[in-house]
């Protein structure tokens, strides 16, 4: 199981590096004003400075460090923890949290990509929100 956790950690770090690289590579191309909030229909309804483009990568980094490394508490598990199942339950908890983090980081990257594309006028001015919301039901 440690191999799976190590693979998942590597995958999370890869997503973080891709998110930060994409942001830094496109920052100088962005106009001074970019969309920073989108309504439920996916259309931008608030605009702000291009420095807001760093909000999602910073939140992703905080999410990775604060949630990814604070899973070792055994007092919040839905089953009784015994000496026999302690290690297995810990691995299951770590896998669950890291999988959710991976999904959220992927959504952050998708939103970042759409914000950059809309700002550079490479795509239509909406984010397809429905598929991300429906994806939450499969977690």
Language model: regions and residue ranges:
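Cysteine/selenocysteine-centered motifs that mediate thiol-based redox chemistry or coordinate metal-sulfur cofactors
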Residues: 70-108
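Short, basic/aromatic recognition patches
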Residues: 4-29
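Hydrophobic core of alpha-helical transmembrane segments in multi-pass integral membrane proteins
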Residues: 13-22, 57-69, 133-139
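Alpha-helical transmembrane segments of multi-pass integral membrane proteins
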Residues: 109-139
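Membrane-water interface of transmembrane alpha-helices
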Residues: 21-31, 64-78, 106-113
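Interfacial helix-start motif at the membrane-water boundary
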Residues: 43-61, 92-98
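Active-site and channel-lining beta-strand-loop segments
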Residues: 23-54
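Alpha-helical transmembrane segments and their helix-start/interface "positive-inside/aromatic belt" motifs
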Residues: 1-13, 48-57
